[in-house]
Amino acid sequence: MPDITSTDLDFAGQEGRSIVQRIEQLEAELRGRGLVVKKGSAEYYLQAQFDGDRRKVWELGRDGLTGVEATLRLVKTFQLTSMQSQEGLRHFSLVNTVIADTCPKRLPCPTTKYRTSDGSCNNLRHPEWGKAFHTYARVLPPRYADGINEARLSYDGGPLPSAREVSQRAFASENRPSRKVTVAFALWAQFLAYDLSLTGVTIAGNGDAILCCHKEIKNNPRLLHPACMPVHILDDDPYFRKYGRSCMHFLRSIAAPRSDCTFGKLKWSIAGGEDMLPTNKSLPCASKDAPCFASGDKRSNQNALLTLIHGVMLREHNRLADRLSSLNPGWSDEILFREARRLLCAQLQHITYTEFLPLLLGNKVMSSYGLSPKLSGYSFDYKADLNAAVINSFATAANRFGHTLVQDDIEMYSSQGARHDESTLQKFDPSLLHSKGSFDALIRGTLRQPAQTFDSHVSNQLKNQLFNDSGYGLDIIALNIQRGRDHGLPGYNEWREYCGLPRLRNFKELESIMDTAVARNFSRLYGNVDDVDLYPAGIAENPLPDAILGPTFACIVAEQFRRLKLGDRFWYENGGMESSFSEAQLQEIRKVTLSRLFCDNTHVEAIQLVAFVKQAGWNPTENCRDGKIQRMNLASWKNEPVWT
């Protein structure tokens, strides 16, 4: 490394801050010209997914971008190599520089039996691990063209194929229902995906959603916001050409400040007469007649099924709180909330690891990664040195496997088993749930309707009409591919190597692990087998013998859930912790199934034993009241020690 002084660091920091200020001036000009996202457009609803604490997101993005621009200044000034910029600059701290105020603040961690709401202080040595508004973890170094933040290029130095072209040529839109899993499985996959990750995207300092595709911007490239990384649409695109579209909106993720504060690469109510989530008229909602529902995640309104599963969890939380209150009448409302939440979190972990993951990953992968919960007793496997944060490749690629499982339409069934209605998954319009009886009818539909098969066939609703506006929408597959490039994800071949699989030497070898037609399409799209993106190849892989996923995605997903299990101080099976359940309580938690949650929180009278799998001889439909679908006994929570 060259000799970089504190003066050099200050100069780079000042330059980084100046660049951010110039971007803010551009944002003001764009607003003045009316070049902002139009309310009600597909771009508007895409942005609405990421609306959390807008001010906090903007501040984090500004601080992270300042550090990135300062790093780029150092790279340019000292002509650093990619290795020097990625590894050498990590030894230079922002502390005591002019941009020290962009460093994340560390807070003390109190001793408690309850999780924090933002995930902080789960790990007492590293309070930021797994925290909301924090960086994703990485298991492979990022692949940026400049070593810092410029999107990956092909191995010959040219651009990668358009993400839309990859989606259009390699992914079909055919109806291929699963022979095994239900819509409930696909719904749980999306529920988990949203619970585990939300990637913040860049917003303007004034709160505007940034516009990337517009005729005026195309004619005057100076007006293109630096955070824009639009997806190019080819002239011969069979769907978008009839609308004259040549550009698909895409904003880069915010640049999160590095937790170690060093220079370096980019890191990335009542409704229908039933208890339901409270409504909030201020939320972005497509329906003019019925407001959207408020939950901890604005994406819960993305479609009626997501709102449905959030509603089930609300009901279960309140059911637990009522029962705990009757057992412990002296508990305050705050203690009831915390204890019910603690128990609900344990239930969700148990359902995920005993019912969902075995279907997704198969028994061999479950065993290899030690994912299966114990049948009795405590676990003492907690690892304080394991970062349980969400892995970048999981959040931006493998965790999005569920998009291939989505049905175009959702079925509804009466209590007599008659299919009486069908609804399209509308953008941010869960108004269906305001109708009496719709909640139970949708639950029955999730249990009876098969999900789509996991493969390179994707619902037309997602591939061409995502957040449909004026006849056309966006393409979720193209956006997923673009997000992987935005985050510097290495190509598919590097992930195979990471997972212990043989590296592919040519496209012919690709044909042996996926559908031949898809492999040949990849060979026409990419110049080198090492160029192939992780997401489309991971989706196209042949599944493992007893699993839904193929080997590469199974590896990434399994590693993520291994970390979430072993690196979680509050894991429900842990013994010897302030948060530990008693052994009697733990045995009751082990009775929980998704079918039981549906039984306890709806008017559905009969459900198959395993809600994620279609009814079969080994998976019969049982009456919710006859005891075959086990029920927790909360008697062992009487006089439970609490923390105030």
PLM region spans:
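Terminal regions of secretory-pathway proteins
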Residues: 1-304, 315, 322-644
